[in-house]
Amino acid sequence: MTDLDFIDVADLRREYMKGGLRRHELTEQPLVLFEKWLKQACEARLSDPTAMCVATVDENGQPYQRIVLLKHFDEKGLVFYTNLGSRKASHLEHNQRVSLLFPWYPLERQVCFLGKAEKLSAFEVVKYFHSRPKDSQIAAWASKQSSRISARGVLESKFLELKQKFQHGEVPLPSFWGGYRVTFDSVEFWQGRENRLHDRFIYQKSPEGWSIERLAP
């Protein structure tokens, strides 16, 4: 196999047979249905059911995506944490609009939220930071996220240095570490169906509440 002998992906296909999504199964509030689907993803023992693809856009209009873990959700929004010097945080300084996608492939489902990311309060950040395993807290100090490094050894050496420094007592919260709450105004639920006639429903928020429409696949 040469470097140019790529896999022929055109014929990699299958039917989606896990079920459907009918209007009578929808809930008035999108977060209620999301919680139901998330519970089912957990019960199905999916790997990282809270993993979501977070899409942001830089000042030139170039979109970027990365996988981040959902850490909390309620009627106020969906919460994730990150290094405030990261690429995503830099983008959010210029444009707060984001897209969050939960791809639950084994269940042939996905949920996409559109909304605006706002920084969490210092109280929320401190509370969550100190709930993390100590090594994870130290790792937050060790990594200057999205910066270029010469080798992995540099990162590992820094981690070991900080582990020695913080071996006794509490790890302080880095000033460059925080979180965001995404307040959403659009949520789409997608369920794979046979013959590519997938079920899609979109919730959109207005002053009157949530409207629900079926979309063509």
Curated annotation (Swiss-Prot):
InterPro entries: Pyridox_Oxase, Pyridox_Oxase_CS, Pyridox_Oxase_N, Pyridoxamine_oxidase_dimer_C, Split_barrel_FMN-bd. Binds 1 FMN per subunit. It catalyses: pyridoxamine 5'-phosphate + O2 + H2O = pyridoxal 5'-phosphate + H2O2 + NH4(+); pyridoxine 5'-phosphate + O2 = pyridoxal 5'-phosphate + H2O2. The keyword Isomerase does not apply. It holds the Pfam family PNP_phzG_C. Its cofactor is FMN. One of its GO terms (biological process) is pyridoxine biosynthetic process. FMN binds at residues 66-71, 81-82, 87-88, 110, 145-146, 190, 200. It comes from the Bacteria. Keywords: Flavoprotein, FMN, Oxidoreductase, Pyridoxine biosynthesis. Pathway: Cofactor metabolism; pyridoxal 5'-phosphate salvage; pyridoxal 5'-phosphate from pyridoxamine 5'-phosphate: step 1/1; Cofactor metabolism; pyridoxal 5'-phosphate salvage; pyridoxal 5'-phosphate from pyridoxine 5'-phosphate: step 1/1. This is Pyridoxine/pyridoxamine 5'-phosphate oxidase. The lineage of its organism: Bacteria, Pseudomonadati, Pseudomonadota, Gammaproteobacteria, Enterobacterales. The gene is pdxH.
